[in-house]
Amino acid sequence: MAGLAATVIGLYGRLQESEKSSSAEKEQTFFLVILYVFLKSGKTMLQSLREAASRRRYIKHLSEVSSFLVRESERRTLADGLKQYVHPSREFTLLLGSLGEDLESGFGVVEKVEKLIEQAISRESDRWKRYVDSVETLGEVVVSVILLIPLIYVVGGLLGGFPLIYSVVIAIAAAAVLYVVSSASEPLHLVDLPRSITFISTAVIFVFGGVLATSLLGFMPVLLGVVAGVATLVWGLFVHFMYVRRAVAEGEASFLLLDGVAARLRAGYPLGRSLEAVADPRYKRYAMAIAHGLEINPYNRFMALAMETVKIARLGGLGAEALSLLARLALSIYLSFTGARARMKLYTALAIASGAAIIAVSAITLAPFTGLPQDVATEVQRLIAVPSIEPVLPLAMLVSYVLGVVVGRIEDQTIAACWRAGAGVLATLLVYSIASAFV
């Protein structure tokens, strides 16, 4: 028992370290941008770390690391604290160590951070490409496993019965693995919807997921499917058009804002008046908000950081060169993110069609048995138990629902993007209504 407890504790510790490492690598780009903005505005490294510690919206984990480094600077020099800090992410440990060495030697820390951002620009597309490749590989395995479920059900039924709950567990476990792995390996988290929307969406997903789970008991599966599908689809489309699309578009707007401000600074125009003169609708609202001191809450984290950067530039703390560098980073991130989303469109189609495919494969597999003459069918039923297609419907709806939620989270970076789940359930019901007429 003691050995098992030690193993569990050790495994939990490893999982925590892995989570910290993943979070650091995911937030590292934002961390570098925050340091760069405040270092270029004239603050010291210690002051810049204090600013980073207060930016939990962008760097939830690394803000805690920044706070720790600030506290450590009270016991020893900041350079020693940076050099001796050990993080589960080897890459982040080396980054802090190199900054500590430059700080100790008196070499340009600002130039080092600038160089690191240049490297981030060049590698951003590669990071997203590797991420999509890994998700696609795992996604193919998951889809293959899920599409085998109807065959397992039918063959198991012919051999004496295969409990449907096993199929449910297999499907949900496969989708859960895809969700966890994709979330952990995400290169950069950009979409940041209001907490209220995320909370309501989570409630919608669990409530109507529970409704579909109830249909496994054989209680009005068609009616429950229609209710869950329509409700999830309507709410998901509302979130998509009101929030997700804006969050994606703000990625381009962040580049336009930073690049436009940099161009005006190079031309010698007063920044405040230039912001008021912006006419491009893609980023006009953000420029006007900065110019008039209005509060606006972007749904894209880089857009929020870009607005904060322009506010600092308006106070005279940043030049055109710094803003141009950040504009190039914003463009690289936007193109990489939208490129990844475009490659994921196939999985949106697969998620929506997964339940329908399960129904179709089940119907095709059962067709040879249900199309027999009456006397032959009676004899076959006496020899083997031919399964029915009706019990497959709740399973197929639940699979399409879960996959729709997972794919929405991967493609749009938020669990609130649940319209695919509702569309999948309705597509499953449509195919079932057709298939049930033949088997």
Question: What are the language-model segments listed below?
Answer:
Residues M1-Q84, S196-E295, A304-K311, L318-A340, ...:
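Juxtamembrane/interface alpha-helical elements of multi-pass membrane proteins
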Residues A2-T7, E118, R123-S182, L335-I434:
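Bilayer-spanning, highly hydrophobic alpha-helical transmembrane segments
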Residues G42, V113, T414:
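Residue-level signature of catalytic and energy-coupling elements of molecular machines
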Residues P88-S89:
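Intrinsic disorder/low-complexity segments
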Residues G100-I121, L315-L329:
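Short, charged cytosolic
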Residues V113, A176-V191:
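Juxtamembrane segments at transmembrane-helix boundaries
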Residues G157-Y166, L190-L193, A213-L224:
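Membrane-helix interface and helix-disruption motif detector
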Residues V191-I200, S388-V392:
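Short, amphipathic, aromatic/basic-enriched membrane-interface segments that mark the entry/exit
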